[in-house]
Amino acid sequence: MSQRKSVAQIFRRPYCQSVAVRFTILGSGSAGNCSHLETDETRVLVDAGFSPRETRRRLAGIGRAPENLSAILITHEHSDHISGLAGLAGKLRIPVYCNRATKEEIERILETRNLEFRLFVTGDSFEIGDLTVDTFAIPHDAQDPVGFIIHSSVGRFGFATDLGHVTKLVLDRIRTANFLVLESNHDVKMLQDCPRRPWSLKQRILSRHGHLSNEAAADATAEILSGELRQLYLGHLSRDCNTPELAFTVMQRRLQQLAANHVSLALTAQDQPCPTLEL
């Protein structure tokens, strides 16, 4: 089996060619989720799960500031996806895109007086600057959780984290992604044996509206694998019930079995951003 190509090998640009899109996962996990996608015209966050101060710090690390954001997209209302929303979007008047059920739950949880909501119906598509955003339903224990496919001039970015199982609809949507963030939350045995998780929480995580295991993520990837997918990020890894090495090994083994050498595999982290992908 030939050695898997690195991100740099797959996305190396001709010398002096300008960068059309930059993508950075600022952090992913149960303590906060946030990704930054930018073009020449548009800069968006997908989720705002870190405090405003921490979000600003992580953006500064990639040479960016929240004042320049065009929008914040919200997948669902759990705290690890919205904890920084009011302080960022409210203070800076950044439009917040979500569906009505998520908005109503956010209004119950946060002070939203200064938030400018722009509502979509799950399943709809809309434009933000030069980006087109497709939305789709995902199975999770939130009011109306969604995933996104974001179309740019250089490819499609998919986001499917926080889902208990992968429906046909989810498969159909993420199959179109060139760059995909997919949940690989836990190892089932580690979760079952974890002394820090009460049985009720274990049941929730393992349910069809909980979180994807490493094996479930690998199974989903096998279902969608095609020439479209070029970069796969493993997201929302549990600190107590998974390890980066285990999540990576399970997915890498599956990709090798499928001879998917065209796919570059990367881990996300809770404590620091991933390297920026420049396209």
Task: List each language-model region with its residue ranges.
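Structured catalytic core of nucleotide-sugar glycosyltransferases
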Residues: 24-34, 75-85, 107, 123, ...
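Active-site metal-binding motif and surrounding structural segment of the metallo-beta-lactamase
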Residues: 52-98
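Active-site neighborhood of phospho(di)ester-bond hydrolases with catalytic His/Asp-centered motifs
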Residues: 46-49, 69-77, 97-100, 158-161, ...
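Metallo-beta-lactamase
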Residues: 100-147, 151-154
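Active-site environment of divalent metal-dependent phosphoester hydrolases
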Residues: 31, 79-82, 103-105, 142-143, ...
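Conserved beta-strand hairpin/beta-sheet module of binuclear metal-dependent hydrolase folds
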Residues: 10-62, 146-161, 179
